[in-house]
Amino acid sequence: MAEAEAAQLKEEGNRHFQLQDYKAATKSYSQALKLTKDKALLATLYRNRAACGLKMESYAQAASDASRAIDINSADIKALYRRCQALEHLGKLDQAFKDVQRCATLEPRNQNFQETLRRLNTSIQEQLRVQFSTDSRVQTMFEILLNENSEADKREKAANNLIVLGREEAGAERIFQSNGVALLLQLMNTQRPELLLAAVRTLSGMCSGHRARATAILHAVRIDRICSLMALENEEMSLAVCNLLQAIIDSLSGEDKREHRGKEEALVLDTKKDLKQITSHLLDMLVSKKVSGQGRDQALNLLNKNVPRKDLSIHDNSRTIYVVDNGLRKILKVVGQVPDLPSCLPLTDNTRMLASILINKLYDDLRCDPERDHFRKICEEYITSKFDPQDMDKNVNAIQTVSGILQGPFDLGNQLLGMKGVMEMMVALCGSEREADQLVAVEALIHASTKLSRATFIITNGVTLLKQIYKTTKNEKIKIRTLVGLCKLGSAGGSDYGLRQFAEGSTEKLAKQCRKWLCNTAIDTRTRRWAVEGLAYLTLDADVKDDFVQDIPALQAMFELAKARTSDKTILYSVANTLVNCTNSYDVKEVVPELVQLAKFSKQHVPEEHPKDKKDFVDLRVKRLLKAGVISALACMVKADSAILTDQTKELLARVFLALCDNPKDRGTIVAQGGGKALIPLALEGTDVGKVKAAHGLAKIAAVSNPDIAFPGERVYEVVRPLVSLLDTQRDGLQNYEALLGLTNLSGRSDKLRQKIFKEKALPDIENYMFENHDQLRQAATECMCNMVLNKEVQERFLADGNDRLKLVVLLCGEDDHKLQNAAAGALAMLTAAHKKLCLKMTEVTTQWLEILQRLCLHDQLSVQHRGLVIAHNLLSADAELARKLVESELLEILTVVGKQEPDEKRAAVVQTARECLIKCMDYGFIKPVS
């Protein structure tokens, strides 16, 4: 019974294979393998699954399956040749050569085997030449580097060559086999910064994607030494060591995603102990006074990237639990650091923000309430332990910690604000005489007032205090933070015109002061950052945003701040937020008139729209932003380091880009300033909402711009996937429509682009929209298909039996919409020109084909008529019998009438095509010239 089912599954797999559905074929063969013990059938199944692997480019799997078939039958020539092909793609040329040599012995006259033998022989000779030269080059490089008397430029060149070699698989293996790790350790011992850097970068390349090498290097160099190098003040060195550790972590945790061929039961090293040791050392670095600010930042970056789960569907969050139990107090210590206090650890401007992000990611990674309660208790105990009436520094640290948590997991921060004494301590510190205390307290109040209920509490209890500090303090840093606090409280009602917190005109005064500080380059960046943050809140008020976009110096000062290398997460986020407010690209809930009436009747507050939030005002603001150079600022922000550019900021940038692209007339300016290129990374990475918004922006640009200019070089291929994602039926109609327009434009450029669109599986979606009831969607999809049919693989789908693709195109030619007819007739003309079989198939798919063709040839739109005549010419050229059928119909009369017309400038192509059709009929002898 099982054997019969296995044979049936094999046949099913063969059918899937013939239909080019290789995934389904693989599934059928795999199911059959579980059911049979018949050796001959097993060999066939493994051999067939290997063929699927080759087609899907899963070469390691293909080689493994072919090997199993050969284990059963060593003379299985198909399996041998398939393994040879797989091994060649995996770069194992010597093993591939042995397999094809065996094939050639079994079938000496097979030209294919002989040709493969010759090709592999040439490749192996070349590989050997490179390998021997690599061996000698490695030796020479180390000799130059370790020789004290070598010239400086020679040493620099040798170091750079070594780094390049370490990044190549063959080069890395040669270095490793030539006792390279020991020699690299010698280089590190020389204490010369440039040699140390070269050694670290070479090791980083050698660890990438190779677990065994990474493990050996980790044990040889030792984790404590790696961390001590990362702790150095040198930024370049710290970053290089961070990259080395990341490469080791990736390889140990299997994140390199490379296929490793071999037995499935092969021994796998247990790397958990090493990974835990790395995490433990990174946590220790956070609280060590010997570690530089740069080193602390890199340790936080590594923890941020590698501890929380990347996919929440994976249940194992043991790494997060380990860090919470063993390192949360250390992270809280970093968050609670106050730079102005003497006991502060070495920090950079980003350190506390990175620690807040880590706390946020750890909290989000917890799976249940008991885990979250445990996390909260650790935070509560830590903060409570810091409260000390005798030691003001400890109190300041406690409030700074709460402030940091409020910038991370906000819900947790809110719970901590509710602890006894926290809000009271904030207010008490505001009244302190020490400026450091005031600074921390004001910042904490700003972060605490995010929730409307808390903001209302602070408006009731703390505004007077903030105003007093603002008036009395001479310290600009405190003054600007107090101003931001007032800005935040003033914008607590959001964009709701009816919920203004302060008197009319107060927010404009605050904004004016923020703009003044923003333009003052004498103030340090960190302080000017607060001015941007103030504007991010105040620009929810339409009067403020209208004034701001008219203040060109303030706009450009903000853009320069965003472009600067010293910018941090907060600056980028605040700038992005301000631009979202100015362009009104935030989500607005749809107002249901009935609900508004109901709310008024029940005396509930109804949000009011500000008069300056109407579309005309928004369009004017967009124009002013473009004129001020917003695109170049956005392009610089997109290029920021991934540690600084968070997914939330990317989403905001995508919203701004989409709003800027709204008017087709502005898209040329956006492309000219590099907006097209800048949108691509936003469409590929970030939040789901952000990726969709960025993809929509790309679609708007791709629909009307020359792709060669908008997305120069290879970038154009990266645009395809985001556009295809917009074809999902879950997206709204406008996104579907503009994605189709963009794909139409791209598919008209080159066959390579058409191939890319086909490989991204866009064709089923395009076909789906050709059935759509919506006229514009159907037209856009048909136009896209008109370009796509130039691709051979698309033509093969029309040639395949058992589908109605050709029938749909023929029927669309008979629709009343001339634009739709034009696109469908264009596709049909291309298809019938490419394959004679399709000419015959066209006459079989529907009985109305001749009537539709005659309508096309008589169409009053010349472009449609021309395409109809081209189809007629293709049918006449395809087959004599088919030509006879056409001549016997009314089509001959139509061709004669059109052919006799005077070929003026507009009609020349139409008349010429009709005459070519008549000449074809004369060639067959169906008609004769009048003379």
Swiss-Prot record:
Chief site of localization: cytoplasm
UniProt GO MF annotations: Hsp90 protein binding
The ranges of the TPR repeats are: 6-39, 43-76, 77-110
Keyword Repeat listed: yes
- The record's ARM repeats, renumbered to this chain, cover 169-208, 211-250, 751-790
Query: What Pfam families does the entry give?
Result: UNC45-central (PF11701)
GO biological process per UniProt: cell differentiation; chaperone-mediated protein folding; lens development in camera-type eye; muscle organ development
Q: Name one GO cellular component term.
A: perinuclear region of cytoplasm
Can you say where in the cell this protein is located? Answer: Cytoplasm, Myofibril, Sarcomere, Z line; Cytoplasm, Myofibril, Sarcomere, A band; Cytoplasm, Perinuclear region; Cytoplasm, Cytosol
SMART domains annotated for this entry? ARM, TPR
InterPro entries hit by this protein: ARM-like, ARM-type_fold, Armadillo, TPR-like_helical_dom_sf, TPR_rpt, UCS_central_dom
Keyword annotations for this protein, in alphabetical order, are: Chaperone, Cytoplasm, Developmental protein, Differentiation, Myogenesis, Repeat, TPR repeat
Q: In which tissues is it expressed?
A: Highly expressed in adult skeletal muscle and heart. Detected at intermediate levels in lung. Highly expressed in embryonic heart.
Q: How does it assemble?
A: Interacts with HSP90 in an ATP-independent manner. Interacts with UBE4B; the interaction may target UNC45B for proteasomal degradation.
PANTHER family membership: FI21225P1, PROTEIN UNC-45 HOMOLOG B
Protein known as: Protein unc-45 homolog B
Q: Which organism is it from?
A: Mus musculus
Q: Which gene encodes it?
A: Unc45b
